[in-house]
């Protein structure tokens, strides 16, 4: 037999009969699913890698060094030396679909959307880089989603991955004043 997800519902399926007699049918609230991955530069170029590294390495969950000490190291040394070297490495794995991490995450979101159908709106986001977490949360809200299920795609919990993503999500929701 097939496994039925609790998210999967027919378009005509309504909320349980807790409504008064004669009340018109009420569709279930729209659910959004957000797959979150770490991130990738927008392109395998030194400028794009620099933007990505600045965002990634500025996260206090990733680098737990006092800001006063870390800022000159990041901006004076790392962001002036690593982007060119890292861009070369990204060029070696970049495909016609972009970064492998972005292409795979996009494919996972598309497959999940196909599986869930109209029962949910599935989007994908990167903690660092694009598509940006905040933009995708806004897209889910704009699509009428009243609930968002967030699925970090990291293989295990870590403060630098899962916690950082959930921190960013919480900050985005607070900025939107969405509860």
What are these regions (language model features)?
Residues 16-179:
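Active-site-proximal alpha-helix that buttresses catalytic centers in soluble enzyme cores
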């Amino acid at each position: 037999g097939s496994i039925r997800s609790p998210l999967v519902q027919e378009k005509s399926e309504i909320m349980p009969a807790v409504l008064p007699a004669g009340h018109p049918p009420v569709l279930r609230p729209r659910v959004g699913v957000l797959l979150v991955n770490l991130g990738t530069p927008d392109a395998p170029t030194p400028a794009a890698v620099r933007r990505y590294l600045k965002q990634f390495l500025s996260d206090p969950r990733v680098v737990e060094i006092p800001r006063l000490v870390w800022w000159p190291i990041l901006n004076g040394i790392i962001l002036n030396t690593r982007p060119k070297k890292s861009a070369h490495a990204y060029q070696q794995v970049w495909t016609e679909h972009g970064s492998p991490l972005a292409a795979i995450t996009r494919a996972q979101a598309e497959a999940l959307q196909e599986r869930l159908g109209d029962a949910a709106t599935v989007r994908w986001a990167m903690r660092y880089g694009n598509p940006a977490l905040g933009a995708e949360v806004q897209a889910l809200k704009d699509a009428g989603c009243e609930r968002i299920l967030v699925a970090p795609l990291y293989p295990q919990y870590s403060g630098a991955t899962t916690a950082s993503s959930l921190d960013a999500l919480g900050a985005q929701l607070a900025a939107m004043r969405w509860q």
